[in-house]
């Protein structure tokens, strides 16, 4: 039995709003300038605000706290409605980019018989919609994934591996790019293999007689697993399978395989599909398993930009491949996901940092002595140490996320152009750029998704018991986030892969003087032969006096760490023996990338920050981030003699502790600078007005309504009554009342 509140809602004992309002009034930070910095440019900031405004005011796309109470099937139904809603925005967004608002049918144009008239959709065409999807994913990650699997994985797999004709057919004529006609999934992972793509077991056997491929699942472990959209939604799959021609295995290639009839959604012959069931989070995604039993597809359904099965008039068959790009092209679809996860890290980090900081400012606990007001959480030094470095994380992620995204799109454009070029030099150049992009995206994806997983849980704990409530977002936020640490590349495997490439670059530079001054000059500038020599000789000293030192210290540490690893590998002849250290290389490389990109941007005109007080606050964020992670990794910094124990305790830690109260003074200005409306936060303890307790209580009551008279017993009420009924006999003997005899016993 429950009963409505009888407390006057206007009575106020604790008033967290006054603290938020005071902090906001006292802040000297220019919020508009900082937000422009965080959104990369004034134009992007304007677009972000316009799209957020549309999203939070769309009755279908917006989310409220009832989102946290939804069950699996409810989530999937709601997600399906939202997918349909997003699809309706897509054509509008493309026309906006093209400035093409005349009364024409974009789908009809894309399907035109004459390829010259059917203008292909480019990355630029999808710029606004991609931005919209990224922002939607911040309030509803499962929706972002559902659409992202179709456009980002299925679509980019076709773009990265298909011929121009195949791209046009699947993405334009069949309507995939506009989410019309067909809906795709990405069938790479198997029950028995995930990260080791080269050992996937699904087979695509070429049938020479019928000029077709036969797709087959040879055993249980080859079952496609975790396939988003497969269980109920996808009509087609981009399937990773072993190409077998005349008995020879050519390795894993990509094929488009129909799964369902798009008009009836009936499974096609030979295709078996099931739902993989309950997951830790993102239940709005219908992840499924797929098995193929002799499924026949035309030869043309093999994506053939870099590997072709060619049938000659005389009946002979040859396999032609472009070795420069064939191997890495197979992973190109995953690049978009990894790049987007770095951007997601900025968006998610800013969301949860905002909630936790506002709560820490408004919440009071314990008075220093009797008669004084209770202290705000944010004024406790330990709380500052727990919260403020986490606030710095999304600040440092933002510049590198936008830079990585821009690099990704420009490199992909070069890839498409190079694969159509007769000039081998173009292929060589874009191949090197892709490899560097793989290193950076792998390192940054792994490191940042780990950082945000830590951020969400640590900040949840700083909000105490209220952080544990689903209505404040941390629980579902964490469950939805941590899949990022294992999908589209397990973080440890990605870290090892990127670090091995960095180690090779280091050895080539240190021992052979090899360094590409064109392609490696940015992310890998610390690997220049001259710089390595200066660090090894001791000419370059570590210190924390100038702003640039907070980045360079990571360059010095990386070189000493890589040199140490090189020595160990030379002795053991086993790269696996240094795996733990290689993961550190990847993390340190990512942290250096983040610091360097932030430093370069804040030092440039492109920072868009003209106010000196604001810029000083931004530099404090930069220094606090670097110092926090130096302190976290102080063991390594001492091991490689970057700092002595005395320097850690007398230089690094005092600087770190001194910065906390300085950044604390700006914390509301820094969180306001993310410019996230309440509807994007969806957490009543973090809303802009700071009315923590009323906002939270009202949302709890709205989602758990109570009858005025307290009527309505739970279904298990009889069980509780029966359990307690075991004591009724004694109660009845005493007349069922608290008589004088009982009270006298209690009071003895």
From Swiss-Prot:
Keyword Flavoprotein in record: yes
Main location per the UniProt record: other
Molecular-function GO terms, alphabetical: acyl-CoA oxidase activity; FAD binding; fatty acid binding; flavin adenine dinucleotide binding
Pathway assigned to this chain's UniProt record: Lipid metabolism; peroxisomal fatty acid beta-oxidation
Listed EC numbers: 1.3.3.6
Localization: Peroxisome
Catalyzed reactions: a 2,3-saturated acyl-CoA + O2 = a (2E)-enoyl-CoA + H2O2
GO cellular component: peroxisomal matrix; peroxisome
CDD domains linked: AXO (cd01150)
InterPro entries, alphabetized: ACO, ACOX_C_alpha1, Acyl-CoA_ox_N, Acyl-CoA_Oxase/DH_mid-dom, Acyl-CoA_Oxase/DH_mid-dom_sf, Acyl-CoA_oxidase, Acyl-CoA_oxidase_C, AcylCo_DH-like_C
Record note on quaternary structure: Homooctamer.
Protein name per the record: Acyl-coenzyme A oxidase
Organism: Saccharomyces cerevisiae (strain ATCC 204508 / S288c) (Baker's yeast)
Lineage of the species this protein comes from: Eukaryota, Fungi, Dikarya, Ascomycota, Saccharomycotina
Name of the coding gene: POX1
């Amino acid at each position: 039995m429950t009963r409505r509140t009888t407390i006057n809602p206007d009575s106020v004992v604790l008033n967290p709003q006054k603290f938020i309002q005071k902090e906001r009034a006292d802040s000297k930070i220019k919020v508009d300038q900082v937000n422009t910095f965080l959104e990369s440019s004034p134009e992007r900031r304007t677009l972000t605000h316009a799209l957020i405004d549309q999203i939070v005011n769309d009755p279908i796309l917006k989310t409220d706290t009832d989102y946290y109470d939804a069950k699996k099937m409810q989530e999937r139904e709601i997600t399906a409605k939202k997918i349909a809603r997003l699809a309706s925005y897509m054509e509008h967004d493309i026309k906006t980019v093209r400035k093409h608002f005349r009364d024409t049918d974009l789908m009809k144009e894309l399907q035109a018989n004459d390829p010259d008239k059917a203008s292909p959709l480019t990355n630029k065409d999808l710029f606004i919609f991609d931005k919209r999807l990224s922002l939607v994913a911040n309030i509803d990650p499962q929706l972002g994934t559902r659409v992202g699997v179709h456009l980002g994985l299925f679509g980019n797999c076709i773009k990265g591996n298909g011929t121009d004709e195949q791209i046009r057919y699947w993405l334009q004529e069949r309507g995939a790019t506009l989410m019309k006609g067909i809906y795709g999934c990405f069938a790479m992972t198997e029950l028995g293999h995930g990260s080791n793509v080269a050992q996937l077991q699904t087979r695509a056997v070429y049938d020479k007689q019928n000029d077709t491929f036969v797709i087959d699942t040879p055993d249980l472990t080859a079952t496609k697993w975790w396939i988003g959209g497969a269980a109920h939604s996808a009509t087609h799959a981009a399937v990773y399978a072993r190409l077998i021609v005349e008995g020879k295995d050519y390795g894993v290639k990509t094929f488009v395989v129909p799964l369902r009839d798009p008009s009836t959604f009936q499974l096609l012959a030979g295709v078996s599909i099931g739902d993989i069931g309950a997951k830790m989070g993102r239940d709005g995604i219908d992840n499924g398993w797929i098995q193929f039993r002799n499924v026949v597809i035309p030869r043309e359904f093999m994506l053939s930009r870099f590997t072709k099965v060619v049938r000659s008039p005389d009946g002979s068959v040859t396999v032609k491949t472009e070795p420069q790009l064939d191997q890495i092209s197979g992973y190109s679809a995953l690049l978009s996901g990894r790049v987007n996860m770095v951007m997601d890290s900025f968006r998610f980090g800013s969301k949860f940092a905002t909630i936790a900081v506002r709560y820490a400012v408004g919440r009071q606990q314990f008075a220093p002595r009797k008669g004084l007001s209770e202290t705000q959480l944010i004024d406790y030094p330990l709380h500052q140490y727990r919260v403020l470095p986490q606030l710095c994380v999304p600040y440092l992620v933002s510049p590198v996320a936008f830079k990585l995204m821009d690099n990704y799109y420009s490199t992909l454009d070069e890839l498409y152009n190079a694969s159509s070029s007769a000039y081998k030099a173009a292929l060589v150049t874009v191949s090197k750029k892709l490899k560097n992009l793989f290193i950076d995206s792998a390192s940054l994806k792994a490191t940042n998704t780990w950082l945000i997983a830590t951020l969400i849980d640590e900040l949840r704990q700083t909000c105490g018991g209220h952080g544990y409530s689903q209505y404040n977002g941390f629980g579902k936020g964490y469950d939805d986030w941590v899949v990022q640490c294992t999908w589209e590349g397990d973080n440890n495997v990605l870290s090892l892969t990127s670090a091995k490439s960095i180690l090779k670059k280091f050895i080539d530079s240190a021992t052979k003087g090899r360094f590409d001054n064109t392609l490696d000059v940015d992310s890998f500038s610390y690997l220049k032969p001259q710089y390595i020599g200066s660090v090894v000789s001791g000419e370059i000293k570590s210190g924390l006096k100038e702003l640039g030192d907070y980045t360079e210290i990571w360059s010095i540490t990386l070189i000493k760490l890589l040199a140490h690893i090189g020595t160990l590998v030379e002795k053991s002849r086993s790269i696996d023996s240094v795996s733990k250290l290689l993961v550190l290389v990847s993390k340190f490389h990512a942290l250096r990338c983040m610091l360097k990109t932030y430093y370069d941007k804040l030092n440039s005109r492109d920072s868009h920050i003209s106010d000196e007080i604001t810029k000083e606050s931004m530099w404090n964020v930069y220094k606090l981030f670097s110092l926090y992670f130096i302190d976290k990794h102080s063991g390594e910094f001492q091991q490689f003699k970057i700092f002595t124990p005395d320097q850690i305790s007398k230089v690094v830690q005092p600087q770190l502790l001194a910065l906390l109260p300085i950044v604390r003074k700006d914390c509301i200005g820094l969180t306001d600078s993310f410019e996230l409306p309440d509807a994007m936060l969806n957490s009543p303890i973090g809303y802009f007005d700071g009315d923590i307790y009323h906002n939270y209580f009202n949302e709890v009551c709205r989602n758990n309504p109570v009858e005025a008279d307290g009527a309505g017993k739970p279904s298990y009420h009889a069980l509780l009554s029966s359990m307690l009924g075991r004591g009724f006999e004694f109660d009845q003997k005493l007349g069922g009342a608290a008589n004088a005899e009982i009270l006298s016993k209690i009071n003895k």
